[in-house]
């Protein structure tokens, strides 16, 4: 078991604390928060130590879990890395690319592992169809949320859209050719609604929309590729696959005839979705990568690129 500590005891921080306590891979030693009262309350609730300083905590742990506002990610991560501590950082990894690039360099220099909390990579609706995604040529994502003041320290791109950016970058094996985007601030001081079009060198195009001032919640991504359409509902944890398959013997849901007389058999399927906790899965995945000296599934490079 890895000795773990959590910095940040807010809403999401307490979720991480609870799950680290549940995991067989971690021994949660304690927590730290700038607000000592919040730290003591969380420590009492979860039966662990409330550290009086961040420096005291990183001297005793193997793994640091950073669940604080984005602006503080870099300073906490840098101190931990320089102390030889492996780091899990909630997304976005940093406030800017200069900071994340420095963490990339420091992690290599100090031989520690960093995983970034792009939790949708562990969403069972995505993992159920991940192996079906192959050379998509058009991708469309919508991530809409009702307003919540948590997360408004950064734009909707770093708050919400970054999840879909990471999913798309992990699914398209091609460099980016061009990005065009627009955004507007509605309530907060940073953009609350944004749209981006990402063009890849292999011809794939991704269109992303994110809003945190919506009347309803939605987290859907659709992949279009040769002979197959894949739809993922991250919110409701459902996936659908529609594909053309001439080799199947089952009765298709429909048969389409092209202008030249060719008949295409269309099949529909809904994969079984597991009931796993995606945050617990990503934390356990990080423990596996440390134990086996493997690259984390969502490492610092992925966080930096997103």
Residue ranges and their predicted role:
Residues 117-124, 147-178, 191-192, 303:
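Mid-domain beta-loop-alpha active-site segment that forms a flexible
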Residues 94-151:
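A contiguous active-site-proximal alpha/beta segment in oxidoreductase catalytic domains
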Residues 16, 46-104:
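Beta-loop-alpha module in the N-terminal Rossmann-like domain of NAD(P)-dependent dehydrogenases
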Residues 52, 89, 114-116, 140, ...:
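Hydrophobic residues in well-ordered beta-strands that form the structural core
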Residues 1-45, 168:
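N-terminal Rossmann-like dinucleotide-binding module
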Residues 63-68, 281-306:
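C-terminal helix-rich "cap/oligomerization" subdomain common to oxidoreductases
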Residues 165-242, 276-292:
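Contiguous beta-strand/loop segments that form the cofactor/metal-binding neighborhood of enzyme cores
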Residues 48, 83-85, 110-113, 204:
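A short helix->loop->beta-strand "cap" motif at the edges of active sites that frequently abuts
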């Amino acid at each position: 078991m890895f000795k773990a500590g959590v910095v940040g005891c807010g809403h999401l921080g307490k979720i991480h604390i609870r799950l680290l306590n549940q995991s067989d891979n971690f021994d949660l030693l304690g927590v730290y928060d700038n607000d000592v009262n919040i730290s003591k309350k969380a420590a009492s609730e979860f039966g662990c130590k409330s550290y009086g300083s961040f420096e005291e905590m990183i001297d005793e742990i193997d793994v640091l879990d950073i669940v604080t506002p984005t602006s503080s990610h870099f300073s906490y991560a840098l101190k931990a890395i320089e102390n030889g501590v492996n780091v899990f950082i909630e997304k976005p990894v940093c406030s800017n690319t200069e900071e994340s690039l420095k963490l990339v360099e420091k992690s290599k220099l100090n031989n520690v592992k960093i995983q970034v909390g792009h939790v949708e990579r562990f969403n069972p609706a995505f993992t159920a169809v991940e192996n079906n995604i192959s050379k998509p040529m058009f991708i469309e994502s919508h991530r809409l949320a009702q307003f919540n003041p948590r997360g408004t320290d950064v734009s909707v791109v770093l708050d919400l859209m970054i999840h879909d950016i990471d999913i798309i970058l992990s699914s398209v094996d091609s460099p980016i050719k061009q990005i065009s985007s627009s955004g507007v601030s509605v309530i907060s001081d940073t953009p609350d609604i944004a749209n981006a079009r990402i063009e890849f060198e292999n011809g794939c195009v991704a269109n992303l929309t994110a809003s945190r001032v919506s009347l309803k919640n939605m987290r859907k991504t659709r992949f279009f590729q040769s002979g197959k359409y894949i739809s993922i509902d991250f919110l409701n944890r459902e996936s659908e696959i529609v594909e053309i398959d001439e080799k199947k013997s089952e009765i298709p849901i429909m048969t389409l005839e092209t202008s030249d007389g060719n008949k295409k058999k269309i099949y529909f399927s809904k994969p079984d979705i597991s009931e796993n906790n995606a945050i617990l899965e990503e934390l356990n995945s990080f423990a596996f990568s440390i134990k086996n000296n493997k690259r984390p599934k969502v490492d610092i490079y992925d966080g930096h690129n997103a």
